[in-house]
Amino acid sequence: RYQRTLERAANWLAGMQSKNGGFAAFDINNTYHYLNEIPFADHGALIDPPTSDVTARCIGFLGKYGKQAHQNAVYRGVSFLLREQEANGAWFGRWGTNYIYGTWSVLEAMQLAKQDMKHTAVRRAVQWLKSVQREDGGWGESNDSYLDPKLAELETSTAFQTAWALLGLMAAGEVKSESVRRGINYLLSAQSSNHLWEEPWFTAPGFPRVFYLRYHGYSKFF
């Protein structure tokens, strides 16, 4: 019933792929970094380069859709993601703070695109997520990590960042791992009396290093 709609969406999405294999939020091949040197371009927002998290969303859909016509786009997108992986195994997150968000996004995309989840890049990402799990079983990351990646740790765990980490680990085949068990226990213990999760943190970047938003649904949806 929805086949034609899905086909049109997939074709349009594949057409938004940039030359380097990645996908951006709004534009194609908008990578002219010299534009950010224009006076008063203090947000660094005159370009829209491909990012790991947006690419992951697009590749996840195209991989799940699974049509042969889009396999080259999936291959190029996965290649982009592998090139973008940080030295510590994480991926940068443009639209959610930060490395936890980006790493979850890519791991889930890899699984949806039917990639080998034993790939070295995947295992490195898993090890990074496990390495930043907090003593209480949760995960947390502050916006300071946009200033210095070494600061990718919050003074407290958050429900939605814990959920991101868990989704990433489970996509990578870690469902029965001790890290996942501890993370789920944290979420159960952090549930409020109204049976939801409440978080005060502003962890949705408008422009990284400039300003951040708070999406009230994050802690409830994820």
What is the predicted role of each segment?
Residues 1-222:
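Preference for long, amphipathic alpha-helical scaffolds in soluble/luminal domains
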